């Protein structure tokens, strides 16, 4: 068993897809780390505010005194610091496209997906259609591939997987909506099954029932504002 490298610490949240993807990367690389769980939606700890005063959110990686926020930046840092089991593609073009689609997921799909959760019943059909149009773009990207990273899990698998099937889809499920039906998205559903077969993914997926309950509480808070 590898010895714990000095100063590798992750400040995260069990329910956060952004934290979970970082854990996937650390586990894939075989990097032992200390983990501190933040209930940051209730109250932000002094430690979190100290480590990430700009965005005040998880995850934050601390490595030998260096502090790094933002999950996608952390994934790239991990990949360049521990070079075994590469996460990002080697070719400059493929690397750029992985970043492009990761940004699309975290900015477009996440934003519109979260917005769809609080739509009124009269507008929910329109919201579902809008989200599914975005998800269809990912369906087209994964067609014919085992994983976004090829034969092994990579950067985009971690970003898409942590956010869509293992977070947003659970929130939609809690509202009685199947946002990624197999008949409409056969390739994505095949990819999700492949993803679930990977040990580090299974280790990092939050408990389904607990996660759905948590997501419904968040939706309730947003609707109450």
UniProtKB/Swiss-Prot annotation:
Q: Which GO terms describe its cellular component?
A: cytoplasm; cytosol
Give the Phosphothreonine positions (modified residues): 152
The UniProt keyword set, sorted, is: Cytoplasm, Detoxification, Phosphoprotein, Transferase
GST C-terminal domain location: 91-218
**Classification via CDD domains:** GST_C_Tau, GST_N_Tau
Q: Where in the cell is it found?
A: Cytoplasm, Cytosol
Pfam short name (any one): GST_N_3
Q: Where does glutathione bind?
A: 16-17, 43-44, 57-58, 70-71
Q: Which reaction(s) does its UniProt entry say it catalyses?
A: RX + glutathione = an S-substituted glutathione + a halide anion + H(+)
Q: What is its EC number?
A: 2.5.1.18
Q: Which principal EC class is assigned to this enzyme?
A: transferase
- A molecular function (GO) term: glutathione transferase activity
The GST N-terminal domain extends over 6-86
Q: In its UniProt record, which GO terms are filed under biological process?
A: glutathione metabolic process; toxin catabolic process
Q: What does this protein do?
A: May be involved in the conjugation of reduced glutathione to a wide number of exogenous and endogenous hydrophobic electrophiles and have a detoxification role against certain herbicides.
Q: Which family does it belong to?
A: Belongs to the GST superfamily. Tau family.
What's the protein here called? Glutathione S-transferase U3
| Gene expressing this chain | GSTU3
């Amino acid at each position: 068993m590898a010895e714990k490298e000095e100063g590798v610490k992750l400040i995260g949240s069990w329910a956060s897809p952004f934290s979970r993807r970082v854990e996937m990367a650390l586990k894939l690389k075989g990097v032992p780390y200390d983990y501190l769980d933040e209930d940051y939606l209730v109250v932000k700890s002094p430690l979190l505010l100290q480590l990430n005063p700009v965005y005040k959110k998880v995850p934050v990686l601390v490595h030998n005194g260096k502090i790094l926020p933002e999950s996608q930046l952390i994934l790239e840092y991990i990949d360049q610091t521990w070079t075994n089991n590469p996460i990002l593609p080697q070719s400059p073009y493929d690397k750029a496209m992985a970043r492009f689609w990761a940004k699309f997921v975290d900015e477009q799909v996440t934003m519109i997906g979260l917005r769809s959760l609080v739509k009124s019943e009269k507008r929910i059909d329109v919201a579902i259609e809008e989200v599914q149009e975005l998800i269809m773009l990912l369906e087209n990207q994964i067609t014919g591939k085992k994983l976004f990273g090829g034969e092994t899990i990579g950067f985009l698998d971690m970003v898409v997987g942590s956010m869509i099937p293992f977070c947003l889809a659970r929130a939609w499920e809690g509202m009685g909506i199947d946002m990624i039906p197999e008949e409409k998205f056969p390739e994505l559903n095949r990819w999700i099954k492949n993803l679930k077969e990977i040990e580090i993914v299974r280790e990092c997926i939050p408990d389904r029932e607990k996660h759905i309950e948590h997501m419904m509480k968040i939706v309730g808070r947003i609707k109450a504002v």
